[in-house]
């Protein structure tokens, strides 16, 4: 690499370059808020926490970060056991003389960043670290010292999917070099909400390129920009997608929690495979402004966390209306519900929970998954739920054979991607539509074409139907029937259900069609003796891979679903029972 200074984050194949000729002991502060100039530097190494410690850190009951909750972390911050700076602190040492031309600067990282460095060369969950993280953490610590707390997540580090644009020094690429270096005029609305709530956006997560909407022969979690994400339970585990890195980062405690996006399964499926909670909100509950789109009808942004309560905390922050996303105007309440308060251990009592058995029969599930699913139903029944069997999705067989759901995505992408590209303030490769995106991808070496094809784009362009075409509306009405009367909403109405449940890997398809919510919770694990299957080099099924259960509900029913999922989680505590083949060892206590 060339340039006056190369700032090399030792995160496997992940590098962030900062071209700035600071002194040996200095490095530029790069501010996400634009408050520091490029000529300003700060000396790193030996920084003192801005908050005087109230007690001896060694006397604190500091949780292991792989299971730490927001409440536990806030308790430690409040007591002065550690600071937000401790969670993201970075110390820089020069390894090679500057004048040799190729300067290597090693980052000696602490806590969350150190945890990323421990495992990222294997799992590739994080594509880059925010060079502003320390600056923002110091600001949050100073505010805490002055008695100003922005909310219950104040000062906690978070990692967000790399298709969510931020107006800072980090890249937002959707995993592609086609928009590497692209800029928007502001943060994505959800990123702004995170900052306003006091969270430290610490980095970006790897994901399936273009949210799994490029290839038919690629693998979950692969992108040209970030490489191949893998999950942590067996070697070369398929992480599912497309929010692959967000799932793995949350699972391994590489941040307090993460954000993902979903069009059809892209939050709940990777959450399932990484043994965490994934909450796909109703389309319109969270803004998609400056989030790389596929479909305006199906795209949504949601939390991925190690517990239901932490997912609820995060949803509380990012939910709400946004004049820049007209789908949010459909939110039916003036005040966002208290999602954290919905976490009630008795929430299952008296609730009618439906089981659409025809989905399991038509799509098929291994018997071990069905057995564990039935055991989960027994847990709910014991907790007071009324289990209603055979609440079938009546149009599911027709849906399973229909090309229409994909055709809707093709039409939306032909319309929504050009609209997004038009919003870019900086567009280095002049990507204006799906055709120019395909052309770039097929001619750029790092995009690995044709070994990873562009079949989804090829089909969309060949069909040539946009969502403004007269042919689109009849297709869309059929799609709505699959999801509404013939799907989840019809089942809820006919059987007077509070929710329906399925093994998570079967849950996303129908709710995707009408934008209804899902929350997945850890349920179990594939046992010894499970047949090992592969997709290219990735293991898609085998002993030790997690299994989740998905709670599906009506539009805007997140409050109810969170309660049901929380009660199930507290009755089962399935997550801590599983073993990983890799996990970081760095802890807060070890760096104080």
Curated annotation (Swiss-Prot):
The keyword Electron transport is assigned to this record: no
Superkingdom as given in the UniProt entry: Eukaryota
A molecular function (GO) term: hydrolase activity
Assigned EC number: 3.5.1.-
Sugar-modified residues: 120, 217, 326, 430, 528
InterPro entries linked to this entry: Amidase_dom (IPR023631), AS_sf (IPR036928)
A GO term from the CC aspect: extracellular region
Range of residues in the leader sequence: 1-21
Top EC category: hydrolase
Disulfide partners: none
Pfam families noted in UniProt: Amidase
Catalytic residues (positions): 161, 242, 266
Keywords: Glycoprotein, Hydrolase, Secreted, Signal
Residues that hold substrate according to the record: 242, 263-266
Main location: secreted
Compartments where located: Secreted
Similarity comment: family membership: Belongs to the amidase family.
Protein name: Putative amidase ARB_02965
Organism of provenance: Arthroderma benhamiae (strain ATCC MYA-4681 / CBS 112371)
């Amino acid at each position: 690499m060339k340039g006056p200074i190369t700032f090399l984050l030792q995160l496997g194949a992940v590098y962030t370059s900062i071209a700035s000729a600071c002194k040996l002991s200095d490095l530029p502060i790069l501010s996400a808020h634009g408050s520091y100039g490029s000529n300003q530097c700060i000396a790193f190494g030996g920084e003192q926490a801005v908050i005087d410690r109230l007690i001896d850190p060694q006397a604190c009951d500091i949780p292991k970060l792989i299971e730490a909750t927001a409440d536990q972390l806030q308790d430690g911050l409040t007591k002065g056991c550690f600071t937000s700076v401790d969670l993201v602190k970075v110390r820089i040492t020069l390894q090679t003389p500057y004048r040799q031309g190729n300067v290597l600067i090693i980052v000696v990282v602490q806590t969350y960043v150190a945890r990323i460095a421990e495992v990222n060369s294997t799992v590739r969950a994080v594509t880059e670290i925010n060079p502003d993280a320390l600056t923002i953490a110091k600001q949050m610590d100073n505010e805490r010292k002055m008695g100003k707390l922005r909310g219950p997540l104040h000062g906690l580090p978070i990692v967000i999917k790399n298709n969510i644009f931020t107006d800072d020094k980090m890249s937002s690429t959707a995993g592609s070099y086609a928009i590497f270096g692209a800029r928007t005029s502001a943060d994505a609305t959800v990123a702004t909400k995170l900052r306003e709530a006091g969270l430290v956006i610490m980095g970006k997560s790897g994901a399936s390129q273009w949210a799994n909407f490029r290839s038919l022969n690629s693998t979950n979690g692969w992108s040209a920009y970030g490489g191949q994400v893998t999950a942590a339970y067996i070697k070369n585990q398929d992480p599912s997608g497309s929010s692959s890195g967000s799932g793995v980062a949350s699972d391994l405690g590489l941040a307090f929690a993460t954000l993902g996006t979903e069009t059809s399964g892209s939050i709940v499926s990777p959450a399932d495979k990484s043994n965490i909670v994934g909450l796909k909100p109703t389309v319109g509950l969270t803004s998609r402004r400056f989030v790389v789109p596929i479909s305006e009808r199906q795209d949504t942004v949601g939390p991925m966390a190690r517990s239901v309560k932490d997912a609820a905390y995060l949803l509380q922050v990012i939910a709400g209306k946004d004049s820049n996303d007209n789908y949010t105007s459909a939110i039916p309440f003036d005040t966002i519900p208290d999602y954290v308060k919905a976490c009630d251990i008795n929430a299952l009592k008296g609730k009618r929970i439906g089981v659409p058995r025809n989905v399991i029969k038509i799509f098929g599930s291994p018997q071990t998954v069905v057995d564990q699913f039935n055991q989960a139903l027994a847990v709910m029944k014991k907790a007071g739920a009324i289990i209603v069997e055979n609440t079938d999705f009546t149009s599911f067989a027709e849906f399973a054979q229909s090309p229409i759901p994909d055709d809707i995505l093709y039409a939306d992408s032909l319309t929504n991607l050009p609209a997004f590209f038009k919003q870019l303030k900086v567009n280095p490769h002049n990507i204006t539509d799906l055709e120019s995106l395909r052309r770039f991808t097929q001619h750029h070496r790092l995009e690995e074409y044709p070994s990873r094809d562009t079949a989804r784009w090829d089909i969309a362009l060949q069909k040539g139907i946009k969502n403004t075409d007269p042919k689109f509306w009849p297709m869309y009405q059929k799609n709505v029937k699959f999801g509404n009367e013939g799907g989840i909403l019809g089942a809820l109405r006919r059987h007077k259900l509070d929710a329906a449940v399925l093994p998570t890997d079967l849950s996303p398809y129908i709710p995707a069609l009408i934008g209804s919510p899902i929350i997945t919770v850890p349920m179990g694990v594939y046992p010894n003796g499970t047949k090992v299957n592969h997709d290219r080099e990735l293991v898609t099924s085998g002993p030790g891979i997690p299994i989740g259960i998905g709670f599906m509900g009506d539009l805007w029913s997140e409050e109810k679903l969170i309660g049901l999922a929380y009660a199930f989680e507290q009755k089962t505590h399935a997550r801590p029972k599983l073993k990983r083949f890799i996990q970081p060892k760095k802890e807060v206590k070890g760096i104080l």
